[in-house]
């Protein structure tokens, strides 16, 4: 019985401690609202996880940088692992082997939640589960988020999808809509 209880707890608990700092250009743009909204829904998922006996932690912050070039450079060099930038800021750049797309956000502009390819796929998968488990709440956090859906958040664009997003997509589409 104890083993069964522990296995059930793992379904609801964070699979690991998560710490993310999401880089954005300005507090005045939608990128900042998206970053704060991601932190909010992940925190909600953590609260649910704790109510089922989970003991892991979440640290979610935003960091400002005025230049998209600097943000991309810091992600490429793995100084920071996450950023939200406008998709149009990536169009005229050479393809980069180290940038990966986590989610696309079709808000007032199209935005991309990116990371470095070296980020643990299980962390990315947990982030995706946290966002998708609370997609309804996420949609109501800002008027430009209302059209978000499962089908328009995970889209292969110019930047390749992160391995964690691919794993998440496979599990989500097969009906494994677990809590993290």
Task: Give residue spans per PLM region.
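Short amphipathic alpha-helical coupling segments at ligand-binding clamshell hinges
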Residues: 34, 119-130
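Extracytoplasmic "Venus flytrap"
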Residues: 19-37
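Beta->alpha turn/N-cap motifs
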Residues: 66-68, 78-90
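Ligand-binding "clamshell"
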Residues: 77, 92-108
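A bilobed periplasmic-binding-protein/Venus flytrap-type ligand-binding module shared by bacterial periplasmic
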Residues: 21-24, 106-123
């Amino acid at each position: 019985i104890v083993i069964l209880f522990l296995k059930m707890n793992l379904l609801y608990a964070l699979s690991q401690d998560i710490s993310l700092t999401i880089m954005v250009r300005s507090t005045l743009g939608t990128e900042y609202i998206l970053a704060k909204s991601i932190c909010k829904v992940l925190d909600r998922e953590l609260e649910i996880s704790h109510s089922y006996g989970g003991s892991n932690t979440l640290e979610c912050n935003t960091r400002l940088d005025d230049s998209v070039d600097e943000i991309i450079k810091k992600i490429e060099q793995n100084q920071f692992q996450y950023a939200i930038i406008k998709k149009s800021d990536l169009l005229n750049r050479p393809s980069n082997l180290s940038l990966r797309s986590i989610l696309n956000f079709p808000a007032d502009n199209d935005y991309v939640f990116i990371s470095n390819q070296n980020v643990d796929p299980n962390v990315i998968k947990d982030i995706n589960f946290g966002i998708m488990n609370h997609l309804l709440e996420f949609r109501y956090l800002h008027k430009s988020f209302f059209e978000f859906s499962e089908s328009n958040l995970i889209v292969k664009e110019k930047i390749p999808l992160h391995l964690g997003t691919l794993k998440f997509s496979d599990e989500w589409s097969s009906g494994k809509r677990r809590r993290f």
